[in-house]
Amino acid sequence: MFQPAPKRCFTIESLVAKDSPLPASRSEDPIRPAALSYANSSPINPFLNGFHSAAAAAAGRGVYSNPDLVFAEAVSHPPNPAVPVHPVPPPHALAAHPLPSSHSPHPLFASQQRDPSTFYPWLIHRYRYLGHRFQGNDTSPESFLLHNALARKPKRIRTAFSPSQLLRLEHAFEKNHYVVGAERKQLAHSLSLTETQVKVWFQNRRTKFKRQKLEEEGSDSQQKKKGTHHINRWRIATKQASPEEIDVTSDD
């Protein structure tokens, strides 16, 4: 059994690698993590032994105060020749030389960045039904995303008719529910409207007329049913027969 290393107090001076007064007996023994001392006492793991030897050599040369140099040299020695380990540059070198924007860390991520349909699985399903609205030879999903807002059919603007125009249109509708051809053209010219505006107004007016007619017929039938129901209840209460049940016979 090996004795555990005594606890050491890490001060700010030791962390920032400033010179601090040390006893003469410990001047040649630099402060290092306890894991390195454990690795030195156990010859089972060759990787830890190699790491410890590299750190000890760096400490003997007096460069242990620079963590970047110790880290680079310790990693640059591969423990196993069959598995090469590339030296890792210090963090400030990585920050000074960032990766280019076009470089992708993995080909899978690059394919997802180039193809927006992978992020929107519903895109292809909608694109099959809306592809006929595009113009040109570009029928890619990117074109769908760019031109989808422009490819929508614009909403029809409702025409604000003046009271005099509405009065003339109502008179024309009372005469004829369908105005076509030269009559519609003449009516539109007299009202300073287009033929399309007159056509749409007559379509809406016919729809309104049919709805009003159905509502009137429905209300009349309900009134008749209510009246018949009250008459039948009165006959049942007074025990009077209906006109169909009365048999009129003459004495002759």
Swiss-Prot record:
Tissue expression per record:
Cerebral cortex.
From the Swiss-Prot or TrEMBL record, state where the protein is found: Nucleus; Cell projection, Axon
Q: Which Gene3D superfamilies match?
A: Homeodomain-like
Q: Where does this protein chiefly localize?
A: nucleus
- GO CC terms of this entry: axon; chromatin; nucleus
Q: Which residues form a coiled coil?
A: none
Q: Where is the composition biased (Basic residues)?
A: 224-233
The record's subunit annotation is: Interacts with translation initiation factor EIF4E.
Q: Which PANTHER family match?
A: HOMEOBOX PROTEIN EMX-RELATED (PTHR24339), HOMEOBOX PROTEIN EMX2 (PTHR24339:SF25)
Q: What does this protein do?
A: Transcription factor, which in cooperation with EMX1, acts to generate the boundary between the roof and archipallium in the developing brain. May function in combination with OTX1/2 to specify cell fates in the developing central nervous system. In the inner ear, it controls the distribution of GPR156 at hair cell boundaries, and regulates the organization of stereociliary bundles in opposite orientations across the line of polarity reversal (LPR).
Q: Which disease is it linked to?
A: Schizencephaly: Extremely rare human congenital disorder characterized by a full-thickness cleft within the cerebral hemispheres. These clefts are lined with gray matter and most commonly involve the parasylvian regions. Large portions of the cerebral hemispheres may be absent and replaced by cerebro-spinal fluid.
Q: What name does UniProt use for this protein?
A: Homeobox protein EMX2
The gene that this protein is the product of is: EMX2
